[in-house]
Regions:
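Conserved N-terminal entry element of GNAT/NAT acetyltransferase domains
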Residues: 1-28, 188-189
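Acetyl-CoA-dependent GNAT
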Residues: 61-107, 111-115
Length: 189
């Protein structure tokens, strides 16, 4: 079993906006698409991966060739690529040095690629759906966490609308981040 409980096999997630699925990134096939998104000024301001495709490729290869604690994925909505996600073991990530991590905390990073996908509420819908799927498929995980840049108000609001709560602000090496947490809801008594 992988560190993320076979994320590629999690299947499609029905949402109000269509069928959502995560597919692990494939190189070199997905590189041009992802490098194009990383060079969009709105995305580049927060992801810092703008530049030639090899900048994006190095970032992806580090995860793909790693030990499985981070899985880079394309987000497909009704079969069309429209987002990029990183699902990772936050408790095993350097992030864990900056907050009181719990075993199996699972982190998410995301970006909505095409400009027409942004500003329509898609991020919140997909975040909520993925957080639920993570908590369902990873019973050992009690929390889904994220750390968007505090300046990225649209992202922070999307996490809030998806049921995450802002827990703290963290001074990370590359940004001041809002620690967002979506905890597993307790079972009714």
């Amino acid at each position: 079993m992988s560190m993320l409980d076979d994320l590629p096999g999690w299947g499609a997630i029905p949402t109000p906006v269509g069928e959502f699925r995560l597919r692990p990134v494939r190189l070199p096939a997905d590189l041009d698409l992802l490098a194009g998104w990383m060079n969009d000024p709105e995305i580049a301001a927060f992801w810092e991966l703008a530049g030639p495709p090899d900048v994006t490729e190095q970032h992806l290869r580090a995860q793909l060739d790693g030990d499985g604690r981070s899985v880079p994925c394309l987000g497909l909505l009704d079969g069309a690529p429209m987002s990029y996600w990183e699902v990772y073991r936050a408790d095993l990530d350097p992030l864990a040095r900056h907050y009181p991590a719990r075993p199996h905390d699972t982190g998410v990073h995301l970006l909505l690629g095409p400009a027409e996908s942004r500003g329509r509420g898609l991020g919140a819908v997909l975040l909520a759906a993925l957080a639920e799927r993570i908590l369902w498929r990873r019973p050992c995980c009690e929390r889904v966490v994220a750390e968007p840049d505090v300046r990225n108000r649209r992202s922070v609001r999307a996490f809030e609308r998806a049921g995450f709560r802002s827990d703290a602000e963290l001074d990370l090496p590359d940004k001041r981040a809002a620690l967002m947490i979506r905890a597993r809801l307790p079972l009714p008594a």
